[in-house]
UniProtKB/Swiss-Prot annotation:
UniProt organism field: Schizosaccharomyces pombe (strain 972 / ATCC 24843)
Swiss-Prot/TrEMBL domain comment: The FYVE-type zinc finger domain contributes to vacuolar localization.
UniProt name for this protein: Glutamine sensor pib2
Membrane topology: Peripheral membrane protein
Protein purpose: Functions as an intracellular glutamine sensor that directly activates the TORC1 signaling pathway, to promote cell growth when glutamine is available.
Annotated keywords: Membrane, Metal-binding, Phosphoprotein, Transducer, Vacuole, Zinc, Zinc-finger
Cysteines paired by S-S bonds: none
Subunit structure: Interacts with the TORC1 complex when activated by glutamine or cysteine.
TM annotation in the entry: none
Positions contributing to Zn(2+) binding: C178, C181, C212, C215
Length: 293
Protein backbone atom coordinates (compact mmCIF):
# COMPACT_ATOMS: atom_id res chain seq x y z
CA UNK A 1 0.00 0.00 0.00
CA UNK A 2 1.25 3.44 -0.90
CA UNK A 3 0.79 6.34 1.45
CA UNK A 4 1.42 10.00 0.79
CA UNK A 5 2.48 12.23 3.70
CA UNK A 6 2.72 16.00 3.48
CA UNK A 7 5.73 17.34 5.41
CA UNK A 8 6.64 20.94 6.02
CA UNK A 9 10.12 21.56 4.58
CA UNK A 10 12.74 23.95 5.81
CA UNK A 11 12.58 26.12 2.69
CA UNK A 12 9.80 28.37 1.39
CA UNK A 13 8.15 25.45 -0.36
CA UNK A 14 6.22 22.51 1.02
CA UNK A 15 6.72 19.28 -0.88
CA UNK A 16 5.12 15.87 -0.87
CA UNK A 17 7.33 12.95 0.05
CA UNK A 18 6.21 9.52 -1.18
CA UNK A 19 7.04 6.38 0.76
CA UNK A 20 6.34 2.77 -0.01
CA UNK A 21 4.05 0.92 2.37
CA UNK A 22 6.39 -2.03 2.70
CA UNK A 23 9.45 0.06 3.45
CA UNK A 24 8.50 3.62 4.44
CA UNK A 25 12.07 4.88 5.06
CA UNK A 26 14.27 3.03 2.60
CA UNK A 27 12.41 3.39 -0.69
CA UNK A 28 12.38 7.18 -0.88
CA UNK A 29 11.97 8.64 -4.32
CA UNK A 30 12.89 12.03 -5.72
CA UNK A 31 10.21 14.66 -4.98
CA UNK A 32 8.49 16.01 -8.03
CA UNK A 33 6.52 19.20 -8.45
CA UNK A 34 4.24 17.37 -10.78
CA UNK A 35 2.56 15.67 -7.76
CA UNK A 36 1.69 18.93 -6.02
CA UNK A 37 -2.03 19.47 -6.19
CA UNK A 38 -4.91 20.93 -4.19
CA UNK A 39 -6.29 18.86 -1.29
CA UNK A 40 -9.64 18.42 -3.02
CA UNK A 41 -8.26 17.46 -6.47
CA UNK A 42 -8.26 13.88 -7.64
CA UNK A 43 -5.00 12.47 -8.97
CA UNK A 44 -4.88 9.61 -11.40
CA UNK A 45 -2.01 7.28 -12.21
CA UNK A 46 -1.21 4.97 -15.09
CA UNK A 47 -3.18 1.91 -13.76
CA UNK A 48 -5.66 3.18 -11.19
CA UNK A 49 -7.11 6.25 -9.48
CA UNK A 50 -7.00 7.74 -6.00
CA UNK A 51 -10.11 9.59 -4.85
CA UNK A 52 -11.02 11.56 -1.78
CA UNK A 53 -8.38 12.91 0.54
CA UNK A 54 -4.64 12.24 -0.03
CA UNK A 55 -4.63 9.70 2.84
CA UNK A 56 -7.57 7.69 1.44
CA UNK A 57 -6.69 4.22 0.14
CA UNK A 58 -10.09 2.57 -0.23
CA UNK A 59 -9.99 2.48 -4.08
CA UNK A 60 -6.45 1.15 -4.37
CA UNK A 61 -6.12 -2.21 -6.13
CA UNK A 62 -3.51 -4.92 -5.60
CA UNK A 63 -2.12 -4.17 -9.04
CA UNK A 64 -0.77 -0.81 -7.94
CA UNK A 65 0.20 -1.69 -4.40
CA UNK A 66 3.87 -1.12 -3.75
CA UNK A 67 4.23 0.80 -7.01
CA UNK A 68 4.59 4.53 -7.58
CA UNK A 69 2.18 6.65 -9.60
CA UNK A 70 3.30 7.75 -13.03
CA UNK A 71 5.14 11.08 -13.19
CA UNK A 72 4.41 11.70 -16.84
CA UNK A 73 0.72 12.49 -16.57
CA UNK A 74 0.23 16.14 -17.56
CA UNK A 75 -2.91 16.47 -15.40
CA UNK A 76 -0.96 16.17 -12.13
CA UNK A 77 0.69 19.60 -12.18
CA UNK A 78 -2.13 21.50 -13.87
CA UNK A 79 -3.50 22.84 -10.56
CA UNK A 80 -0.54 25.22 -9.96
CA UNK A 81 0.16 27.92 -12.49
CA UNK A 82 3.34 29.86 -13.19
CA UNK A 83 1.80 33.10 -11.92
CA UNK A 84 0.85 31.63 -8.53
CA UNK A 85 4.15 29.89 -7.73
CA UNK A 86 6.87 31.10 -10.11
CA UNK A 87 9.64 29.70 -7.89
CA UNK A 88 8.47 26.17 -8.56
CA UNK A 89 8.83 26.52 -12.28
CA UNK A 90 12.14 28.36 -11.92
CA UNK A 91 13.72 25.61 -9.85
CA UNK A 92 12.20 22.76 -11.84
CA UNK A 93 14.54 21.48 -14.53
CA UNK A 94 12.91 18.17 -15.45
CA UNK A 95 10.38 19.56 -17.91
CA UNK A 96 12.04 20.93 -21.06
CA UNK A 97 9.02 23.10 -21.85
CA UNK A 98 9.25 24.94 -18.50
CA UNK A 99 13.01 25.29 -18.51
CA UNK A 100 13.23 26.45 -22.12
CA UNK A 101 13.24 30.21 -21.36
CA UNK A 102 15.98 29.78 -18.79
CA UNK A 103 17.99 27.58 -21.14
CA UNK A 104 17.70 30.25 -23.81
CA UNK A 105 18.83 32.88 -21.31
CA UNK A 106 21.85 30.74 -20.45
CA UNK A 107 22.56 30.36 -24.15
CA UNK A 108 22.32 34.11 -24.64
CA UNK A 109 24.66 34.69 -21.69
CA UNK A 110 27.18 32.22 -23.11
CA UNK A 111 26.97 33.90 -26.52
CA UNK A 112 27.56 37.31 -24.91
CA UNK A 113 30.59 35.91 -23.08
CA UNK A 114 31.94 34.51 -26.34
CA UNK A 115 31.41 37.87 -28.06
CA UNK A 116 33.21 39.67 -25.21
CA UNK A 117 36.13 37.27 -25.55
CA UNK A 118 36.21 37.84 -29.29
CA UNK A 119 36.23 41.59 -28.68
CA UNK A 120 39.08 41.24 -26.21
CA UNK A 121 41.03 39.21 -28.74
CA UNK A 122 40.38 41.76 -31.47
CA UNK A 123 41.77 44.64 -29.37
CA UNK A 124 45.13 45.83 -30.65
CA UNK A 125 48.17 44.91 -28.56
CA UNK A 126 50.25 47.32 -26.54
CA UNK A 127 51.95 50.25 -28.16
CA UNK A 128 55.36 48.58 -27.96
CA UNK A 129 54.22 45.38 -29.62
CA UNK A 130 52.22 47.26 -32.25
CA UNK A 131 55.18 49.49 -33.09
CA UNK A 132 57.46 46.46 -33.41
CA UNK A 133 54.93 44.68 -35.61
CA UNK A 134 54.48 47.79 -37.74
CA UNK A 135 58.21 48.21 -38.19
CA UNK A 136 58.61 44.56 -39.14
CA UNK A 137 55.77 44.74 -41.66
CA UNK A 138 57.20 47.96 -43.08
CA UNK A 139 60.66 46.42 -43.33
CA UNK A 140 59.35 43.30 -45.06
CA UNK A 141 57.11 45.26 -47.44
CA UNK A 142 59.81 47.69 -48.50
CA UNK A 143 62.45 44.98 -48.99
CA UNK A 144 60.40 43.18 -51.63
CA UNK A 145 61.38 43.82 -55.22
CA UNK A 146 64.78 45.51 -54.70
CA UNK A 147 67.71 44.14 -56.64
CA UNK A 148 70.28 42.07 -54.73
CA UNK A 149 72.51 41.09 -57.62
CA UNK A 150 75.20 43.56 -56.59
CA UNK A 151 75.43 42.33 -53.00
CA UNK A 152 78.77 41.03 -51.81
CA UNK A 153 78.72 37.44 -50.44
CA UNK A 154 79.02 37.04 -46.69
CA UNK A 155 81.98 34.70 -46.99
CA UNK A 156 84.09 37.35 -48.73
CA UNK A 157 84.10 39.79 -45.80
CA UNK A 158 85.06 39.13 -42.18
CA UNK A 159 85.66 42.74 -41.08
CA UNK A 160 83.52 45.86 -41.48
CA UNK A 161 84.17 47.57 -44.83
CA UNK A 162 84.17 51.07 -43.33
CA UNK A 163 87.75 52.45 -43.57
CA UNK A 164 88.26 53.33 -39.89
CA UNK A 165 86.31 50.36 -38.45
CA UNK A 166 87.91 47.09 -37.36
CA UNK A 167 84.87 45.21 -36.08
CA UNK A 168 85.05 41.49 -36.83
CA UNK A 169 81.84 39.70 -37.59
CA UNK A 170 80.85 36.86 -35.32
CA UNK A 171 78.14 35.76 -32.94
CA UNK A 172 77.48 39.23 -31.50
CA UNK A 173 78.47 41.45 -34.47
CA UNK A 174 76.37 40.59 -37.49
CA UNK A 175 76.84 41.52 -41.14
CA UNK A 176 74.64 44.20 -42.71
CA UNK A 177 74.43 44.84 -46.46
CA UNK A 178 74.11 48.33 -47.84
CA UNK A 179 71.21 48.25 -50.29
CA UNK A 180 72.85 50.71 -52.66
CA UNK A 181 76.50 49.71 -52.89
CA UNK A 182 76.04 46.10 -51.75
CA UNK A 183 79.03 46.16 -49.40
CA UNK A 184 78.99 44.65 -45.88
CA UNK A 185 79.25 46.79 -42.75
CA UNK A 186 78.68 46.53 -39.03
CA UNK A 187 75.49 47.75 -37.39
CA UNK A 188 77.06 51.12 -36.47
CA UNK A 189 78.12 52.04 -40.01
CA UNK A 190 75.03 50.70 -41.77
CA UNK A 191 72.21 52.35 -39.82
CA UNK A 192 71.07 55.04 -42.28
CA UNK A 193 68.02 55.11 -44.57
CA UNK A 194 67.85 56.61 -48.05
CA UNK A 195 65.08 56.60 -50.70
CA UNK A 196 65.88 54.30 -53.60
CA UNK A 197 64.19 52.85 -56.64
CA UNK A 198 64.04 49.16 -57.49
CA UNK A 199 67.29 49.50 -59.44
CA UNK A 200 69.02 51.11 -56.39
CA UNK A 201 69.07 54.71 -57.66
CA UNK A 202 68.38 57.85 -55.68
CA UNK A 203 64.77 58.97 -55.84
CA UNK A 204 62.97 61.46 -53.60
CA UNK A 205 59.69 59.57 -53.99
CA UNK A 206 61.24 56.13 -53.49
CA UNK A 207 61.00 53.80 -50.51
CA UNK A 208 63.50 53.98 -47.66
CA UNK A 209 66.21 51.31 -47.57
CA UNK A 210 69.18 50.59 -45.33
CA UNK A 211 72.41 52.21 -46.43
CA UNK A 212 75.93 52.74 -45.22
CA UNK A 213 77.38 56.06 -44.12
CA UNK A 214 79.18 56.69 -47.43
CA UNK A 215 76.05 56.17 -49.54
CA UNK A 216 74.09 58.36 -47.14
CA UNK A 217 76.48 61.30 -47.65
CA UNK A 218 76.34 60.76 -51.40
CA UNK A 219 72.57 60.97 -51.19
CA UNK A 220 72.82 64.25 -49.24
CA UNK A 221 75.07 65.74 -51.95
CA UNK A 222 72.68 64.58 -54.66
CA UNK A 223 69.69 66.06 -52.84
CA UNK A 224 71.53 69.35 -52.30
CA UNK A 225 72.26 69.61 -56.01
CA UNK A 226 68.61 68.94 -56.79
CA UNK A 227 67.51 71.68 -54.38
CA UNK A 228 70.04 74.12 -55.83
CA UNK A 229 68.89 73.44 -59.37
CA UNK A 230 65.26 73.95 -58.41
CA UNK A 231 66.08 77.26 -56.69
CA UNK A 232 67.99 78.46 -59.79
CA UNK A 233 65.02 77.61 -61.98
CA UNK A 234 62.76 79.66 -59.74
CA UNK A 235 65.15 82.64 -59.94
CA UNK A 236 65.29 82.46 -63.74
CA UNK A 237 61.51 82.33 -63.97
CA UNK A 238 61.12 85.38 -61.73
CA UNK A 239 63.73 87.35 -63.71
CA UNK A 240 61.91 86.65 -66.99
CA UNK A 241 58.48 87.54 -65.64
CA UNK A 242 59.49 90.96 -64.17
CA UNK A 243 60.48 92.70 -67.49
CA UNK A 244 57.35 91.40 -69.20
CA UNK A 245 55.18 92.91 -66.49
CA UNK A 246 57.09 96.23 -66.76
CA UNK A 247 56.52 96.48 -70.54
CA UNK A 248 52.90 95.44 -70.52
CA UNK A 249 51.91 97.60 -67.52
CA UNK A 250 53.70 101.01 -67.60
CA UNK A 251 53.35 103.39 -64.63
CA UNK A 252 50.01 105.18 -64.68
CA UNK A 253 49.61 109.02 -64.88
CA UNK A 254 46.62 111.27 -64.06
CA UNK A 255 44.11 111.45 -66.89
CA UNK A 256 43.57 115.26 -66.86
CA UNK A 257 47.18 116.31 -66.45
CA UNK A 258 48.99 118.86 -68.61
CA UNK A 259 52.75 119.11 -68.59
CA UNK A 260 54.06 122.65 -68.06
CA UNK A 261 57.67 123.44 -69.00
CA UNK A 262 59.91 124.80 -66.32
CA UNK A 263 62.03 127.74 -67.49
CA UNK A 264 65.74 127.68 -67.01
CA UNK A 265 67.54 130.04 -64.69
CA UNK A 266 69.09 133.08 -66.40
CA UNK A 267 72.82 133.27 -65.81
CA UNK A 268 72.79 137.14 -66.02
CA UNK A 269 70.75 137.55 -62.85
CA UNK A 270 73.13 138.62 -60.11
CA UNK A 271 70.79 137.97 -57.24
CA UNK A 272 69.78 134.57 -58.51
CA UNK A 273 66.09 135.33 -58.37
CA UNK A 274 63.85 133.09 -60.37
CA UNK A 275 61.41 134.60 -62.87
CA UNK A 276 57.74 134.69 -62.17
CA UNK A 277 57.08 131.80 -64.60
CA UNK A 278 59.13 129.50 -62.41
CA UNK A 279 56.49 129.64 -59.71
CA UNK A 280 54.35 127.30 -61.77
CA UNK A 281 55.88 123.87 -61.40
CA UNK A 282 54.76 120.39 -62.18
CA UNK A 283 51.53 119.61 -63.93
CA UNK A 284 48.27 121.62 -64.00
CA UNK A 285 44.84 120.07 -64.70
CA UNK A 286 42.81 121.15 -67.73
CA UNK A 287 40.00 122.65 -65.70
CA UNK A 288 42.31 124.91 -63.75
CA UNK A 289 41.08 128.51 -63.57
CA UNK A 290 43.84 131.10 -63.76
CA UNK A 291 43.44 134.25 -61.68
CA UNK A 292 43.22 137.59 -63.57
CA UNK A 293 44.14 139.85 -60.66
Amino acid sequence: MTTVHQLSGHGPLSRLNIYSGASPYTQRVRPSYELIEAPTRQATNGTGSVSGSPNSSSNSTPANQGSLPSHTNPQLYSSITRKERPELFRSYSGNPRLSKPYASSKLAASSRTASYQAMSYSVSPTSTNSSVATSLNYQSSRETGISKDHWKPDSDVSVCSFPSCSVRFGLFDRRHHCRRCGDIFCALHCDRNIPLTMDVKFCLAGSLYRSCVSCFYEYLKWKQSIDLASSNDITVIESTIAPQQATTHPPSQPKNAVSVPIPKMDSTDSKGELPSESLVLGTVPDNWVWSTF
